[in-house]
């Protein structure tokens, strides 16, 4: 009898906030749904449309909003990890071309253990209905 396929989380509702041409950092938002029986650790973000990507957390420190690089984030078993404005988000750096509203961009999350989860993110001015806002 064969081994059961590994459980893989799903990346959905992905979007990137549109920005003026020449902008060097764009924010990406999505929901990582983890239907697995164990938590998963998100280690990195990559996209062929950007030179590099990072995971950032926004925190209020002494009344000031600050972003910091997060080396790893956890999506709980049977739960989700939300990347949303004002909170944890994907910082996509140095676009390889100017992106305009309506463009679709592949984005990939790298999980601990080597699993990769990917989706197309739409470039938008505002969050789509029922998305990571």
Identify the meaning behind each predicted range:
Residues 1-133:
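Compact, glycine-rich, soluble single-domain proteins
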């Amino acid at each position: 009898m064969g081994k059961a396929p590994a459980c893989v989380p799903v990346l959905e509702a992905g979007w990137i906030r549109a920005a003026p041409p020449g902008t060097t950092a764009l924010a990406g938002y999505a929901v990582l749904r983890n239907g697995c029986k164990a938590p998963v650790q998100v280690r990195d973000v990559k996209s062929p449309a950007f030179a590099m990507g990072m995971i950032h957390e926004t925190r209020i420190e002494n009344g000031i909003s600050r972003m910091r690089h997060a080396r790893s984030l956890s999506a709980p078993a049977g739960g989700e990890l939300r990347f949303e404005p004002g909170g944890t988000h994907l910082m996509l750096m140095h676009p390889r071309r100017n992106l305009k509203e309506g463009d679709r961009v592949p984005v990939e999350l790298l999980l601990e253990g080597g699993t990769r989860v990917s989706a197309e993110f739409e470039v938008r001015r505002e969050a789509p209905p029922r998305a990571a806002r």
